[in-house]
Design a protein with these regions (language model features):
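Short beta->alpha linker loops
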Residues: 34-35, 112-116, 137, 239, ...
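Glycine-rich active-site/cofactor-binding loop and its immediate structural neighborhood
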Residues: 74-118
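Conserved thiamine diphosphate
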Residues: 127
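Active-site-adjacent beta-strand anchor residues
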Residues: 33, 111, 132, 159, ...
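Alpha/beta enzyme core
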Residues: 85, 99, 103, 120-124, ...
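Alpha/beta catalytic cores of nucleotide-metabolism and tRNA/nucleoside-modifying enzymes
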Residues: 1-48, 273-290, 294-356
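Short, conserved beta-strand segments within well-ordered enzyme catalytic domains
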Residues: 51, 66-68, 77-81, 107-111, ...
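An N-cap/entry alpha-helix motif that binds or orients negatively charged groups
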Residues: 1-71, 169, 176-217, 353-355
């Protein structure tokens, strides 16, 4: 399908085009949330209920969008959140996404469930890459992933803590979701964990998680990982302030306020609603990031004003990738950067620090 990308002015335009381009099963996988998808809609709608109060008569002719996260400098407080199976959206998959993030001067978080290997992605990456980690029942396999990520040059580990078991994603169940022929979880090859189980009643990914992921994951494992990792470890999937405090106690360098794109437990709070309590709980001791529902520059300003160090963007990157590969993913980051810059100026701010 030919699309005139010159008419695309926001991430929603890319989303609409991707819906027409992607096979239904792939679009449903990327777009869907858990159960009734209440939290899926709330993740963005909650931003609309927060109002900005701008300052006026300030010199906004020069701006600085750069910031530091875990001591790492990025061009803007907008990161690529981890999402699985990029090669379903475009043949170059995660490699194209990494190049786009590098060109934009920001961080890509590479998923464990990547359809490109850590080594292939890092050989093409021109910027910072963090590795998102799921904990497998086989701890040696888990540790091997961490060591490979570190050896390849990943500068942080984002441990997902809200997905020891899989949420009920009804679109995937109806589609009997599985990876298309020729695609696999490249980071687990050739260990026999790179494909979904052959026998499955509904979602192949849900069956894979039950087969491989460790439901006994606990705070002891966080301590274990922090003791083994040579790079900072963040916990991704924190919504409760007490868990944020425990993250500090167990050695985490940061938390990512996330509800897994509303794909795990439906009716949990929108991430922006959970953010203020978590920022208060950590009291500046570790860094706080957020993802979920961010589609506009004003959303980014609101998240930073409420205490987030940076935001992660997931689905929009996939829409850009599906429409135009590396250039589409880069265009999504450009759109968000410009929209954030404009919103920041209209609020009377000239730097990320001023927003806070």
């Amino acid at each position: 399908m030919a699309v005139d990308k010159r008419e695309f002015v926001n991430v929603f335009d890319y989303e609409a085009a991707a819906r027409e381009i992607l096979p239904k099963f792939a679009h449903d996988y990327y777009r869907s949330g858990a159960n009734d998808e209440i939290t899926l809609h709330e993740n963005h709608n909650a931003y609309e209920r927060i109002k900005l109060k701008p300052r006026v008569l300030r010199d906004i002719s020069k701006r600085d969008l750069t910031t530091t996260i875990l001591g790492q400098t990025v061009s803007m407080p907008i990161l690529v959140a981890p999402t699985a199976f990029h090669c379903m959206a475009h043949p170059e998959g995660e490699v194209a996404t990494a190049r786009a993030a590098g060109t934009a001067g920001t961080i890509m978080m590479l998923s464990t469930l990547s359809t490109s290997s850590i080594e292939d992605v890092m050989s093409e990456a021109t910027g910072l890459v963090w590795f998102q980690l799921y904990v497998y029942k086989d701890r040696e396999a888990t540790l091997s992933l961490v060591q490979r990520a570190e050896s390849a040059g990943c500068s942080a580990i984002a441990l997902t803590v809200d997905a020891q078991i899989w949420g009920r994603r009804e679109r995937d169940i109806k589609n009997h979701f599985r990876l298309p022929e020729g695609l696999s979880i490249k980071n687990l090859m050739p260990a026999g964990r790179e494909q979904f189980p052959k026998e499955q009643a509904d979602s192949g990914l849900a069956a894979y998680v039950t087969w491989q992921f460790d439901p006994t994951l606990s705070w002891k494992d966080v301590e274990w990982l922090c003791s083994k990792a040579k790079v900072p470890v963040l916990l991704k999937g924190v919504l409760h302030p007490e868990d944020a405090r425990l993250a500090i106690d167990h050695g985490a360098a940061g938390v990512i306020v996330s509800n897994h794109g509303a794909r795990q437990l439906d009716t949990v709070p929108a991430t922006i609603e959970a953010l203020p309590e978590i920022v208060e709980a950590v009291d500046g001791k570790i860094e706080v990031l957020i993802d979920g529902g961010i589609r506009r520059g004003t959303d980014i300003v609101k998240a930073l004003a409420l205490g987030a160090k940076a935001v992660g963007v997931g689905r929009p990157i996939i829409w850009g990738l599906a429409v135009d590969g590396e250039q589409g993913a880069k265009r999504i980051l450009d759109i968000l950067r410009k929209d954030f810059d404009l919103a920041m100026r209209l609020c009377g701010c000239t730097s990320v620090e001023e927003i806070k």
